[in-house]
Amino acid sequence: MKVFSVVGITQSGKTSTVESIIGELKRRRYSVGSVKDIHFEAFAIDTPGSNTYRHRQAGASLVTARGLQETDILYPLRLPMKKILEFYDQDWVVLEGVRDINAPKIVCAHDEEGIEALLDASVMAIAGKVANTGLKEYKGLPVFNPLTQAAALTDYVLAKVPPLLPDFDRQCCGLCGMSCQELLAAIIRGEKEPEDCLLRQNVELHIGGKPVTMVPFVQEVLAKTLTALVSTLEGYEPGKEISLVWQPRKLKE
């Protein structure tokens, strides 16, 4: 899965940029998902007095509204992006307004001051209404008009965005010699490749069908523990793949 975010202030052209890229990706036969981050504090799809609202008021911790055209699962909290992305299996997920993720970003702005306010090492391009000023480049970053340059912008996205990287601190992993955020910035600059991420999952753990990313130390502990348990069993062969599926049962009190 490849993920990137389009960020910017209100009315700077974010949604138009997202629409243009999604449309181009679909025309090129990619599957696409999207996430819209809403910063309006009072925002809620559920409304007081609705049946689903009454379910929640009665004590339901998770409520689902199932209609003929769509199904909405209403979580009563703001989910982290890592959790949200677990629901997606598309080739691409385009985020709008999301900043708290280790992924490349496109900044939309009205002017250069607006660009500068959001500029950091994760930014790979500029787009939105600032393109109407005639600006073609800003500090080495290309500027795209999403309405007239949708194909060129999508070409750039396809060339620049790596598969979603981990998001660990240097102290937690650091196998590549830098933090995950620093590695992303180096990939955007063309100094590193996605393959330079040395966090290889030779031990895979799934909980509830969802993969769990583990740092090398945890992988090693799990591998050594499992190997110690099964190495005494008949049929064990060093170097052969070991698969374990565990369906926990509630213990009797």
Residue ranges and their predicted role:
Residues 6:
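Hydrophobic anchor at the beta1->P-loop junction of P-loop NTPases
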Residues 35, 92-96, 104-110, 115-144:
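Conserved beta-strand/loop subsegment of P-loop NTPase cores
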